[in-house]
Amino acid sequence: MLVTKLAPDFKAPAVLGNNEVDEHFELSKNLGKNGAILFFWPKDFTFVCPTEIIAFDKRVKDFQEKGFNVIGVSIDSEQVHFAWKNTPVEKGGIGQVTFPMVADITKSISRDYDVLFEEAIALRGAFLIDKNMKVRHAVINDLPLGRNADEMLRMVDALLHFEEHGEVCPAGWRKGDKGMKATHQGVAEYLKENSIKL
């Protein structure tokens, strides 16, 4: 489990948003001001994967406005990533997504993030990494279960709230909601006002 630990850094080829290939793309050199969202999908040209990739891509600006870059990874080569980007959505492609697509052809990144499944493909892992390279949130889904990009945005908001105010974010917390002081009195006050909504 990587939560609370430093995210494994890596250097690998990546197809960038402008379709150029960076042969030495490094996670640590591509964080946003506040961190990054690193997410894995099993394989290009498959089924649930394009829905997740398009969903994250549609929210790239939302993540960037909060200071987080989105970075995607699969075990495919940069050539396969490029071909998938250049396949129209109506033909099962992903179109011109704007975030970097890392080529984990050695499977070492998937292995380091503990998402490598049967030494073949990555499970649907997503990691919220802060500006200090610390993993603050992780979710790993089985192959048939797609992830929710809006939930990752909610977790980004929660982390930013905690960093700014020092308050923890209770169950179901959304941006604009009250946080909670991490004390016995803080939880008692919060539950008195909010337990019915939980």
Swiss-Prot record:
| Parts of the chain that traverse the membrane | none
Q: Name one GO molecular function term.
A: thioredoxin peroxidase activity
Question: What does the record give as the active site?
Answer: C49
Q: Which reaction does it catalyse?
A: a hydroperoxide + NADH + H(+) = an alcohol + NAD(+) + H2O
By its UniProt entry, which SUPFAM superfamilies does this protein fall under? Thioredoxin-like
Q: Name one Pfam family in it.
A: AhpC-TSA
Q: Name one GO biological process term.
A: response to oxidative stress
Question: What PROSITE patterns would the database entry show?
Answer: THIOREDOXIN_2
Keyword match Cytoplasm: yes
* E.C. number: 1.11.1.26
Subcellular localization is given as:
Cytoplasm
Keyword annotations: Antioxidant, Cytoplasm, Disulfide bond, Oxidoreductase, Peroxidase, Redox-active center
Question: Which Gene Ontology cellular component terms are annotated?
Answer: cytosol
Q: Which residues form the Thioredoxin domain?
A: 2-161
* InterPro entries with a match to the protein in the record: AhpC/TSA (IPR000866), Peroxiredoxin (IPR050217), Peroxiredoxin_AhpC-typ (IPR024706), Peroxiredoxin_C (IPR019479), Thioredoxin-like_sf (IPR036249), Thioredoxin_domain (IPR013766)
Write down the superkingdom of origin.
Answer: Bacteria
Q: What does this protein do?
A: Thiol-specific peroxidase that catalyzes the reduction of hydrogen peroxide and organic hydroperoxides to water and alcohols, respectively. Plays a role in cell protection against oxidative stress by detoxifying peroxides.
Instruction: Mention any additional remark.
Output: The active site is a conserved redox-active cysteine residue, the peroxidatic cysteine (C(P)), which makes the nucleophilic attack on the peroxide substrate. The peroxide oxidizes the C(P)-SH to cysteine sulfenic acid (C(P)-SOH), which then reacts with another cysteine residue, the resolving cysteine (C(R)), to form a disulfide bridge. The disulfide is subsequently reduced by an appropriate electron donor to complete the catalytic cycle. In this typical 2-Cys peroxiredoxin, C(R) is provided by the other dimeric subunit to form an intersubunit disulfide.
Subunit structure, interactors included? Homodimer; disulfide-linked, upon oxidation. 5 homodimers assemble to form a ring-like decamer.
Give the UniProt family note. Belongs to the peroxiredoxin family. AhpC/Prx1 subfamily.
Provide the protein name.
Alkyl hydroperoxide reductase C
Organism annotation: Helicobacter pylori (strain ATCC 700392 / 26695)
- Gene for this protein? ahpC
